[in-house]
C-alpha cells in the first residue's frame, strides 16, 4: 500500500485463501469505519451509520494503516519527518510551486466533467488558477454566500474574472442553512462545531452542482492550513511547537476537514479531489524546516504565497489577502444564525443540565450542545468517533478562546471582518 499514490479505502478478499486485507489512504481522504460485533468479529463500513446496531463502538479506521489477521499495521505515517530539507527559501518555494502544480495536474485527469469550488481565499484560488492554466477552455468554478455581498463572493468573483472561468454564484438563505443542519450532522457523523459550520455551505453548493450541472468531479482547497498554518499558528511559541501542531492536524484530518470534503461532495454523487493532499506534496512540505514556516514575514502561509508571487497566477490582493474562515466567509450571518438558533433552542437551565450528560467532549456552548444532541439522535453513544472539538491550541498564549473560528483571534485580518 505504501507504493500507491491514491485516495482510497478498500477491502481485498482472497477467496482462495479465505482471507482479507482492509486499508485506508495515508491521509484518510476516503472514509472507512470499523467495530466489533458481540462475537468479536470485526465489521467494516464506508459510513458509520451502517454499523449502528451491529457493533458496540464505531471507530474510524486509522489512515495510513492496513488490517490483516486481526492486527492493524502502519504502512505510512504521512506526518512523520526523519530529517528536514537543507534548502534555501527560493528552492523550497520553487519545489512547492512545482509539486502543487503536479498535484493539480494529476487530479484534472478524469472521465467525467470536472468543476472547482472557489471560495476566493488563497488555497482554492491557487487550485483554480493552476487548473485554468492547464485547461484549454474555461474551467467551471462555484462560490457560495449568504448574500451577493458576502466577503468571499466578492473575492471569488475577482479570481474568476482574472482566470477567465465560467463562474456561478450560489446564494443561500437562513432557512436553507437551518433546514440543512440536521442532514449535515447525519451525513458527516460528527458533532464538531467548525466542521458542521463549514459543511453546511459546502453541502448546499454541492447539492446545487449535482442538481444543475453535469459535473461529477470537484477539486477543492483543503489541507493547505494543516501544512502551512492556521491563523492561530501565528502564536506558535517555537518552530518545534509549530511542527508538532502540524503533525497533529495532519494525523487528525480524517475527523475534520477531509471528512467534510468527502461527505458533502460524495453524498451529492460527486467525487472529491484534493490537490493539497497529494502525497508527494504533503511529504515535501512536512519536511520543510519549520523555522521557515513560522510567521516571521507579516503574513501567514508566506512560503505558499511567495511560491506563486510575480508569476501572474493570481492578483496580488488575492495572493496576499488575510485569511477568512470558510464558514465565516460564506457570510458572517450564517454562523450568527446558527448561534442564535441554538440560543433559542435551549434555556440556560436546560443547557446547564443537558451538557452534563456527556463525559467525552462535553458541549460548552448551546451551539455545541445542539450539534451533540443531533449527533446522538443518529449515532447514540458513538462520540468516540471524534477525538474532541477542533479548537486552536489553548496551551499557546493568544489561543485560549472558546470558539474554533479565526474571528475570535486577536490577529484576525481586516479582510475577514
Residue spans for each PLM region:
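Conserved catalytic micro-motifs used in adenylation/nucleotidyl-transfer and phosphoryl/amide-
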Residues: 1-74, 126-128, 218
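Acyl/amide activation-and-transfer machinery of modular secondary-metabolite enzymes
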Residues: 73-82
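A short alpha-helix-loop-beta-strand transition element characteristic
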Residues: 57-60, 314-322
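Short secondary-structure junction motifs
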Residues: 5, 111-113, 321
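ATP-dependent adenylate-handling active sites, centered on carboxylate activation for C-N bond formation
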Residues: 15-21, 26-39, 81-312, 326-341, ...
Amino acid at each position: 500500500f505504501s507504493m500507491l499514490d491514491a485516495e482510497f479505502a478498500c477491502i481485498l478478499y482472497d477467496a482462495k485463501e479465505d482471507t482479507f486485507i482492509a486499508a485506508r489512504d495515508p491521509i484518510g481522504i476516503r472514509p472507512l469505519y470499523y467495530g466489533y460485533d458481540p462475537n468479536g468479529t470485526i465489521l467494516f463500513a464506508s459510513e458509520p451509520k451502517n454499523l449502528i446496531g451491529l457493533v458496540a463502538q464505531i471507530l474510524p479506521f486509522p489512515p495510513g494503516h492496513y488490517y490483516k489477521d486481526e492486527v492493524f499495521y502502519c504502512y505510512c505515517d504521512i506526518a512523520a519527518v526523519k530529517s528536514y530539507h537543507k534548502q534555501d527559501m527560493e528552492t523550497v518555494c520553487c519545489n512547492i510551486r512545482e509539486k502543487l502544480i503536479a498535484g493539480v495536474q494529476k487530479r484534472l485527469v478524469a472521465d467525467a466533467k470536472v468543476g472547482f469550488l472557489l471560495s476566493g481565499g488563497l488555497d482554492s484560488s491557487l487550485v483554480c488558477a493552476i487548473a485554468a492554466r492547464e485547461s484549454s477552455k474555461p474551467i467551471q468554478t462555484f462560490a457560495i454566500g449568504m448574500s451577493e455581498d458576502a466577503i468571499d463572493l466578492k473575492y471569488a468573483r475577482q479570481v474568476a474574472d482574472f482566470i477567465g472561468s465560467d463562474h456561478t454564484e450560489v446564494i443561500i438563505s437562513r432557512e436553507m442553512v437551518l433546514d440543512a443542519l440536521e442532514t449535515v450532522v447525519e451525513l458527516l457523523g460528527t458533532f464538531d462545531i467548525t466542521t458542521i459550520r463549514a459543511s453546511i455551505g459546502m453541502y448546499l453548493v454541492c447539492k446545487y452542482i449535482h442538481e444543475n450541472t453535469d459535473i461529477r468531479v470537484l477539486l477543492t482547497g483543503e489541507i493547505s492550513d494543516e501544512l502551512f498554518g492556521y491563523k492561530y499558528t501565528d502564536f506558535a511559541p517555537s518552530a518545534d511547537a509549530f511542527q508538532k501542531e502540524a503533525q497533529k492536524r495532519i494525523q487528525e484530518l480524517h475527523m475534520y476537514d477531509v471528512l467534510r470534503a468527502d461527505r458533502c461532495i460524495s453524498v451529492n454523487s460527486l467525487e472529491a479531489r484534493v490537490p493539497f493532499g497529494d502525497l508527494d506534496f504533503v511529504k515535501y512540505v512536512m519536511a520543510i524546516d519549520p523555522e521557515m514556516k513560522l510567521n516571521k514575514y507579516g503574513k501567514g502561509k508566506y512560503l505558499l504565497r511567495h511560491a506563486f508571487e510575480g508569476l501572474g497566477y493570481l492578483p496580488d490582493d488575492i495572493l496576499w489577502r488575510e485569511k477568512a474562515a470558510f464558514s465565516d466567509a460564506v457570510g458572517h450571518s450564517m454562523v450568527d444564525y446558527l448561534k442564535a438558533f441554538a440560543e433559542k433552542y435551549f434555556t440556560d437551565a436546560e443547557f446547564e443540565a443537558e451538557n452534563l450528560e456527556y463525559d467525552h467532549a462535553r458541549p460548552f456552548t448551546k451551539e455545541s450542545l445542539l450539534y451533540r444532541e443531533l449527533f446522538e439522535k443518529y449515532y447514540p453513544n458513538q462520540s468516540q468517533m471524534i477525538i474532541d472539538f477542533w479548537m486552536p491550541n489553548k496551551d499557546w498564549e493568544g489561543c485560549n478562546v472558546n470558539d474554533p473560528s479565526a474571528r475570535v483571534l486577536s490577529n484576525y485580518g481586516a479582510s475577514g471582518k
